[in-house]
Amino acid sequence: MERQQHRAQVVIVGSGYGGSIAALRLAEAGVDAVLLERGRRWPVDDAGDTFATQTAPDGRAAWLSKTSPLTDAKLDVYTGVLEFVPGSGMNVLAGAGVGGASLASNGTMCQPSAELFAHTLGDVLDYREMRERWYPEARALIGCEPVPDDVYHSEFYRSARSFADQLDKAGIPWSKVDLAVDWDVVRQEMAGTRVRSQIDGLNVFGVNSGAQRSLDRTLLARAEASGHIDVRPLSVVTAVHPADGGDGTGYHVDHDRIDERGTVVSRHRITTDRLVLAAGTLGTNRLLLRARETGALPALDAALGTRVGNSEVITARTGMQENNPRQGGPAAVIAQDWRENPLGPVSLLNFPWPDAPEGEGWITTIGSVPAPALGAFHYDPDKDDVVLTWPADDPALARAQSAITHTLDRLDEANPGSRTAFSRIGTTGGNVVGGVPLGTVTDDAGRVNGHHGLYVVDGSLLPGTGVPPALTVAAVAARVSERLVSDVAGRS
């Protein structure tokens, strides 16, 4: 099948937080760009059945796979919202669709403390600059706010209030967390005029009510409306090469157009002066490592693929007062055991469990610890893909687990009758970040060292944050995008 040839001033790969913010800032500057997204569009309508749910999973839950680690159901092969890639010691979940991971996430927007930030990014970025400019800008772009009091005190969010009450008894600080949620739509769910989604905790594969402020409906929609951004869904980028001559004056971006069952319908090549990689941790590492190891971009830094982190913690506790059978979401409350824990800072977010066993008083949490970025992606030529290696038995991870256990023990001791059913640092990571270390593989503005016109603007820049990473990804993307726009406008 012959490749069709195209030309674009700027090409963006991926439409998650990094790609969408870059697209919006380029559009505002009047710069034309093509955005390639491997997944489909997911328009939410009044029917309220756009996405699969945890209680009724189907092919929409997984990217071109008959299985998903999030369900035991056998799935039809479809271009669904989450790709699962097995690794050694750690598996990876990656978003797919126009809007990227914002479609199928908790929408949790946490800003790390100065100490947590220093642990992971302090050698590259100034926290004061991030705190005063880029975190507020990211919040404004996303449009996030904590759960309003009337929603929080409703019957649907009893589990969040129970968690907060237990934290108070244990003397563990907590706060309501900023969320990328339209609370007016949640109120409509509560009133019965929109399909029940967030209030039933049905948000893992997308939010059918439209309450999720996903990027395709917010800032990426603004970028498209400008007329400067051409979003091309179902476009799977397979390779990047230097343009003819390899003198650093541009890149070829090879990609396949597919249908919703994954069949290739046409092949394309776009040549561009500026290539912005925003394909997420998995996608960006996949493209760059493939380019280095196949000789397309052999001079990419040796640190490429390293410093991969996953700070995600999964816990479940039982023996509490009975909660509502369908727990309202997304996570409304964050425990911030950042200073009193002698073993290290721990964050815990109450996470809705839509089918928790009745009569047993379960609360589940997803949390974060500043676990060391010990993982690494490697290119496997037999698979023509990357594999994540994660040293699950490393002593540093055992220390992080001990910090989590300390927080949970305090909760159980302060709340007689409760107990921890399980706790572990996740082995299937939805918050895996890193592999393209900011300030090492790139400069501090996301420009790939030694490769003029090549940028990275997603979570692969970060080795971790100690809290769920989405807000930091967006804040760093806003910072990188300012330099990108300046470079394009100045032709530097």
Predicted regions and their residues:
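FAD cofactor-binding and catalytic pocket of flavoenzymes
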Residues: 75-93, 101, 105, 110, ...
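Glycine-rich loop(s) and the adjacent beta-strand/alpha-helix scaffold that form part
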Residues: 28, 32, 39-54, 226, ...
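Alpha-helix capping and helix-loop boundary segments enriched in small/acidic/polar residues
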Residues: 122, 210, 263, 299, ...
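Conserved redox-cofactor binding core of oxidoreductases
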Residues: 60, 123-236, 422-432
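A short acidic-Thr-Gly-centered motif at the start of a beta-strand
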Residues: 1-5, 23-28, 221-225, 260-269, ...
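N-terminal glycine-rich phosphate/pyrophosphate-binding loop and immediately adjacent elements
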Residues: 2-119, 125, 277-279, 283, ...
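A glycine-rich dinucleotide-binding beta-alpha-beta segment and adjacent secondary-structure elements
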Residues: 7, 200-203, 238-241, 399-465, ...
